[in-house]
Amino acid sequence: QDGPIPP
């Protein structure tokens, strides 16, 4: 999952 928070 892309984003500032890792999956």
From Swiss-Prot:
Gene Ontology biological process terms, A to Z: regulation of blood pressure
Keywords of the record: G-protein coupled acetylcholine receptor impairing toxin, G-protein coupled receptor impairing toxin, Hypotensive agent, Pyrrolidone carboxylic acid, Secreted, Toxin
Any one GO molecular function term: toxin activity
Predominant location: secreted
GO cellular component assignments: extracellular region
Note: Negative results: weakly inhibits angiotensin-converting enzyme (ACE) with no clear preference for either C- or N-domains. It does not potentiate bradykinin, and does not affect angiotensin-1 pressor effects. It does not bind to type-1 angiotensin-2 receptor (AGTR1). It does not bind to the muscarinic acetylcholine receptor M3 (CHRM3).
Protein's name in the database: Bradykinin-potentiating peptide 7a
